[in-house]
Each structure stands twice: as C-alpha cells, then as structure tokens.
Amino acid sequence: MSTCGDNSKIFQDIQNFIQDYDLNKDYSVTSSEIYQSFLKKMNGDSLKASQAAGVLCSTVDMDNDGKFSYYEISKYCADQAKKQIEQNAETAALADVEALLLRLDKDKDKKLNKTEFVKFFKEQGYNPYSDPDYVLKIIDLDKDGYVSASELQEWFKQKRLAYARGPIC
C-alpha cells in the first residue's frame, strides 16, 4: 500500500532514474547505458563501473534482457521507497522507546513491568480501567509479563508504518 505522497515521490524517482541513465534520450534504458553512466561517474574506472552496473542491473532487470522496462524501473523505485520508509520507522521507533524508557522505566531494567506499563497506558489516553492487560498481551510478544525495549520498538515501528501508509490512492 502506498500513499499519494509516496506515489508522487516514486514517480519522480522513476523520472530521475530515466533522466540519469537514458544517455541517448530515447526513453529506454539499457545495461550498456547504465555501465556508461557509471563509467563517467567513476572517472573512467572500468572495474568499479562494471561492478556498480552489475549490481544495479541484477537488481532492476528482472527478465535479464539487458533493457529496463518502465515496470522494472517503477518496481525498483517503489522497493527503494518502501525500504526508506521502513528504515525511517525503525529509527523513529528507537527514539520513541528511548524517550519512553527514560521517562517510565523507574527500575532501569530496560523493560516496563505492569505498574510502569499502566502509567504508559494512561499517558496514551487509554482508560486505565478498560483493559491494560489486553494491550499488554498484544505488545508483550514473548508473554513474560514485561514489555521489553525490543517489543516496544516493534510496536512503535508498526504504528509508524501504519500511519505512513495513510490514505490509499
């Protein structure tokens, strides 16, 4: 799933990819053009250009025909955008967890016990009498009765990814 913003970014990435590598401006990108582009960018170092072109070609040219279809380029750009979103969510989740543990982890064991978790539960705007045990069970993946830093990080990451998906276009 992607958002409207993701789609326009991916479209721009596709246009940039074609602009960067379509040397003869025929709106078609070939493995030869990829190699020539890298050769120019790497000041004539044919070994490095060959290696870089090989990696990119093996990643993008799914049918190994030496040509990059619009579908292949768009899939590559969409995959790159997805990886970036996931990396950003992971980094932000880590920062969220560190801030949360600094504030709520009174015994400094890098996990929240039930008392600490109920405080977190209240801060999130949940009614503490509704069912903190239910939410604890959802976040507590290993079911040890504590919410560890890694469990919190995964939970925050999934919430951020869900938010990043936003409305579907």
UniProtKB/Swiss-Prot annotation:
Ca(2+) 2 binds at residues 140, 142, 144, 146, 151. One of its GO terms (molecular function) is calcium ion binding. InterPro entries: EF-hand-dom_pair, EF_Hand_1_Ca_BS, EF_hand_dom. GO terms for cellular component: cytosol; extracellular matrix. Transmembrane segments: none annotated. Keywords: Calcium, Metal-binding, Repeat. Signal peptide: none annotated. Ca(2+) 1 binds at residues 105, 107, 109, 111, 116. Residues 9-44, 60-83, 92-127, 133-162 form the EF-hand domain. This is Calcium-binding protein G. It comes from Dictyostelium discoideum. The lineage of its organism: Eukaryota, Amoebozoa, Evosea, Eumycetozoa, Dictyostelia.
